[in-house]
Amino acid sequence: MKRKWLAALLAASLLLSLTGCGGGDSTESTSQTLSQSEQEVTQPVTSEPEYNEDADTIQTAPVKSGTIYISGDRGYSTYGFSESNTLEYCRTVSQAARELQGVATVYNIAVPLACGIDFSNAVQEEMGWSNQGEVCDFIYDHLTDGAVAVPIYDTLRQHKTEYLYFRTDHHWTALGAYYAYQQFCQAKGVEPKALEDYETMTFDNFLGSYYEDSGNNTALGNAPDTLVAYLPSSTNEMTFTDRNGTVTPWKVVYDATNYSRGAKYNCFIGGDQPYEEIHNPTLNDGSAVLVVKESFGNAFVPFLVDDYQDVYVVDYRYYNGSINDLCREKGIDDVIFCNNLNATGTPSRISDMQRIL
């Protein structure tokens, strides 16, 4: 769905047509000329119906508390678009797709932040925040070389009244990640597993990063999150390799009941480890997927376990290998870049991704 920022271009194109017939940081600009390859846009493979984007959104501006903003009992970080940085991210994902042609299909999931889903467009404009729907469109329109866009902004916006993001933490919930999994399956042309088919584990009294960043805001402290995790049915076993190279058996979803109140998000895939493997004993079809992620990908990975024989995960901030080599070594079919929008516009994160290609 193209948004306001494309309206002028579309109008101009229509005018020219009639005449011819006779009748994803602060916003930056870039003077770089896109290459021919970069202009060959990979269109999103899914489409979603039109809807009232501002329905059920927050209509009043949040207030500052510590380094974040508060609205009611919810915390929010901010988002600013950098065109030059985001273009570099698109080039990086497209480079991965180009180098893996004939080996694996590369998918990209750009995850909006909560402020871009919960607040009305008018409030976001008032706060000086970039429109994340427009940024997601920008990213998907600048993927090339066969990289496949998995659009999730509209889906999340349509489900905005559900528990998609934590109140006291900057991450999305497993439910938000599930909707991204559904969209990935649509992009891949397969049927997603129904949410009701998963068993769950629930961890109460989660007070995440926003609680600390707000200076222990009372409203947040009085509204701790409940974390619901969905367990794969095929296996809950995995291994991770830590930053010292030690391989440790672990759980895809670990019982975080006794974790500290701020660490419960680490129930997913052992937290932020450089490298992880999950092997599904119920499949023998050779299917394999690699997820290239930062911490937002942690809640997403468990939904892939039942669909592939092998699931590999790298956190590009800490991994020191080459995903190009890894795909060839492990026979990986699909590569999924899963990044929140702040990561897609942060030079250090983009450099980390480029380092492991």
Regions found by a protein language model. Give the residues of each.
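Extracellular glycan-modifying ectodomains
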Residues: 21-357
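Sec-dependent bacterial lipoprotein signal peptides
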Residues: 1-19
